[in-house]
């Protein structure tokens, strides 16, 4: 019994510790009860995160059905107000966007990406966004278009090798390499040709970066004990593998140094615009980027450009293969716009109405941003709901895009929903594949041009077809980004 003997002081300390631990564990979970907002019951430390084991999009959909347009969840100890009411969404993303809300929450585990546009807040965010915005104007996209066409031609040639052998294509592999080649070429004037070099370190490293798990021990540690975030940040711990961020920052630093040392007139690309902001601002530091900010924006552009475009193209190809009547109608528009497989030009491509409908419908089913987040900088009341300071407001686009009260037959692929006749009836705060408001996806138009060019040039020559390797319907991955659990495989059938 001696092993179990404790002094009165020790027992007092033990009881005090357990009491404090229980208070700490349960303390935040009365937030939504006090606000009069319903939601799933949290468990100590985890909050409602254990539901993510079935997929966060499934969880969001179930909550919307059960609790209506507003509910509360807990990511660990962090209260998260979930909103699908269009009026509240408009206030959060647009009306009060800059005055009462800042960017998504910061877990302090960003590594060297601490000053990327997706993490920056308030004045820093405004400064970076203002420098980057000119990269994505229609004029810039037209300049980039011929460069994109070089890589779309490489994509067709690579796909042809599989088509000639009647072999299925792993779509993400092809579209990922195409996206990477377009991004690095248009952003940095560097041709890595990952379509022909799939083991290129740019591609292998970006794949490592995309492996994110909501139940990652580092993520859970910060979710359970938020005060650890800034401490772990001091030790330079990050969600992203250090070897990956080191590789990209070293590569981008070399590209930047070579650009600055070169006397030749370089292409006016994403990198050059950022470098020019330093040269042209003089003493006006509020109109330029630091050296590190330039590298961070370059890194996030590679990451976002690769993942969003390649995933959207993959889902689009699947939707066309499983809806051949839609694909046939799209091919008819392509043939009418570019007769006899004529070269694709920017302006007519941008004016293709049915192509827009098809892409919009695919993005409805598989939005690039399945969740949008903002954090309250100060307490604010919107539509009778009090949002306290530091509250995370989350807008789940997945259930919004699949709400049967808004979209009849929500699981069906019906591009006509976005026809001229119907699109004016679509609430812009219901359909938000790229987000909305001042903080929407800055590369939205770039991604759409990249997607349109690839799908039109492929469908000029081929049709997508399901095969025995195609999983219909496919199973969604439950971790991290919106993606299929297993690679989507299709065949290309030459058009007669």
UniProtKB/Swiss-Prot annotation:
GO terms for cellular component: endoplasmic reticulum membrane. Putative steroid 6-beta-hydroxylase. Belongs to the cytochrome P450 family. Gene3D superfamilies: Cytochrome P450. It is an enzyme of class 1 (oxidoreductase). It is found in: Endoplasmic reticulum membrane; Microsome membrane. PANTHER family: CYTOCHROME P450 FAMILY 3 (PTHR24302), CYTOCHROME P450, FAMILY 3, SUBFAMILY A, POLYPEPTIDE 65 (PTHR24302:SF32). Keywords: Endoplasmic reticulum, Heme, Iron, Membrane, Metal-binding, Microsome, Monooxygenase, Oxidoreductase. This is Cytochrome P450 3A56. It holds the Pfam family p450. Heme binds at residue 441. Highly expressed in liver and intestine. Moderate expression in gill and spleen. Low expression in kidney, brain and heart. SUPFAM superfamilies: Cytochrome P450. Its EC number is 1.14.14.1. Its cofactor is heme. One of its GO terms (molecular function) is iron ion binding. It catalyses: an organic molecule + reduced [NADPH--hemoprotein reductase] + O2 = an alcohol + oxidized [NADPH--hemoprotein reductase] + H2O + H(+). The gene is cyp3a56. InterPro entries: Cyt_P450, Cyt_P450_CS, Cyt_P450_E_CYP3A, Cyt_P450_E_grp-II, Cyt_P450_sf, Cytochrome_P450_3A. It is a peripheral membrane protein.
């Amino acid at each position: 019994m001696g092993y179990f003997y404790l002094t009165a002081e020790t027992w007092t300390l033990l009881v005090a510790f357990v009491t404090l631990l229980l208070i700490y564990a349960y303390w935040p979970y009365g937030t939504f009860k006090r606000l009069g907002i319903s939601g799933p019951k949290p468990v100590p430390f985890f909050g409602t995160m254990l539901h993510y084991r079935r997929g966060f999009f499934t969880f969001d959909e179930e909550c919307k059905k059960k609790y209506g347009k507003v509910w509360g969840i807990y990511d660990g100890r962090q209260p998260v107000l979930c909103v699908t009411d269009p009026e509240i969404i408009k206030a959060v993303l647009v009306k009060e966007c800059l005055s009462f809300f800042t960017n998504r929450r910061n877990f302090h585990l960003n590594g060297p990406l601490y000053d990327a546009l997706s993490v920056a807040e308030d004045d820093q965010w405004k400064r970076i966004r203002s420098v980057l915005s000119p990269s994505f104007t229609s004029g810039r996209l037209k300049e980039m278009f011929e460069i994109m066409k070089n890589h779309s031609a490489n994509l067709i040639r690579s796909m042809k090798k599989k088509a000639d052998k009647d072999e299925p294509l792993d779509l993400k592999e092809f579209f990922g390499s195409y996206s990477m080649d377009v991004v690095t070429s248009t952003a940095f004037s560097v041709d890595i040709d990952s379509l022909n070099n799939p083991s290129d370190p740019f591609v292998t490293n970006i794949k490592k970066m995309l492996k994110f798990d909501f139940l990652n021990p580092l993520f859970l540690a910060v979710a359970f004990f938020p005060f650890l975030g800034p401490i772990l940040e001091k030790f330079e711990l990050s969600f992203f593998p250090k070897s990956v961020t080191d590789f990209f920052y070293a590569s981008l630093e070399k590209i930047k140094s070579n650009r600055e040392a070169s006397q030749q007139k370089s292409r006016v690309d994403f990198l050059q615009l950022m470098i020019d902001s330093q040269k042209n601002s003089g003493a006006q530091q509020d109109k330029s980027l630091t050296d590190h900010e330039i590298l961070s924006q370059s890194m996030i552009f590679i990451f976002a450009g690769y993942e969003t475009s390649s995933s959207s193209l993959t889902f689009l190809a699947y939707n066309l293969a499983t809806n051949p009547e839609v694909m046939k109608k799209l091919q008819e528009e392509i043939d009418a716009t570019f007769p006899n497989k004529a070269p694709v030009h920017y302006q007519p491509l941008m004016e293709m109405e049915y192509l827009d409908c098809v892409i919009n419908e695919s993005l409805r089913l598989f939005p690039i941003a399945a969740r949008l987040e903002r954090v309250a900088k100060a307490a604010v009341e919107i539509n009778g709901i009090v949002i306290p300071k530091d509250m995370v407001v989350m807008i789940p686009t997945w259930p919004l895009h699949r709400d049967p009260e808004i979209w009849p037959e929500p699981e069906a692929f019906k591009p006509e929903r976005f026809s001229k006749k119907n699109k004016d009836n679509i609430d812009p705060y219901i359909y938000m594949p790229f987000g909305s408001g001042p903080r929407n996806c800055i590369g939205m138009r770039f991604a759409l041009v990249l997607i349109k060019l690839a799908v039109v040039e492929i469908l000029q020559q081929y049709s997508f077809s399901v095969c025995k390797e195609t999983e219909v319907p496919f199973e969604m991955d439950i971790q991290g980004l919106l993606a299929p659990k297993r690679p989507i495989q299709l065949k290309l059938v030459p058009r007669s």
